[in-house]
Amino acid sequence: FKDGALSYGKVIYYGNKYIGDIWCYGIDEINEKMAMLSIVIFEKELWGKGIAAQATKDFIKEVFNKYDVEKIGAFTYAFNDRSIGLLEKTGFSKIEIFIEDGIESIYLEKHR
């Protein structure tokens, strides 16, 4: 991490059941004014139900209110259609397609 960079996260519950995590890492309020986002829903049967989309919308709003950042970035593999769909549905735009360790990947951003 850069000096002054932070991380912040929350657990995701569906009913009373812990089903995943969402977090921002590398939160930089000084230089780049940005953070990076990660989210995981553990149980495949809960994918596609809007749970991750709602958690992402709520969490991003909270991060923009809590931290002095202008954008949030996210990486995903180009073959991960669900992740790309989630990010685009919640306001992220594709910025760059690149190859990492032989795998096509995508970088997306959402601006304040």
Question: Predicted regions: what is each one?
Answer:
Residues F1-S7:
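Active-site rim helix/loop that mediates acceptor-substrate recognition in acyltransferases
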Residues S7-R112:
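Acyl-donor (CoA/ACP) binding surface of acyl/acetyltransferases
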